[in-house]
Amino acid sequence: MKSKIIIFFLIFIYILKANLLIAENLNIKSKKIKIDEKKGITIFQNKVEAYDQSQNYVSGNYGEFEKNKEILILKGNVNLKTKEGYTVSTEQIKVDNLSGIIESTEESLLKDLEGNEISVEMFRYNRDNNIFSSVGKIIVNDKNKNKYKFSEIYIDEKNKKIIGSDLRAF
């Protein structure tokens, strides 16, 4: 009886550990996949789609995944939908699965659930605390057709708050 309990406990630990390992990975799919062993990357082409452990969804035309660093770079008509429902359209996004950061140095358009549109030169999204941040030229067009310009902005998805600096309203 004692050995059965030990075996059951070991199986339980194994299953739990296996599920944790799966949760830490990105789930990536594409119509065309190629492995470049020299560079240590996997290349995805034609409708690349990926979900991270927080269920954030990102898609694009082309992607490269570096397994050792757990970094996915998507290029070409890239779209991000966060688990909270915010969307981002841009030309390139980097998903750092180890740090939990999704970012772009390209011009991007963010849309929140209330219909506000935020145009940024770059952004950084922390999936652990659901906060977007950006510095540079930022234009917010709210649902009431008001236009605001900022030089720095923070968007808290969970609390639905936008905090900006150097406001200019038009």
Name every feature range the model reports, one short phrase each.
Residues 1-23:
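Gram-negative bacterial Sec-dependent N-terminal signal peptides
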Residues 19-170:
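N-terminal amphipathic/hydrophobic interface segments
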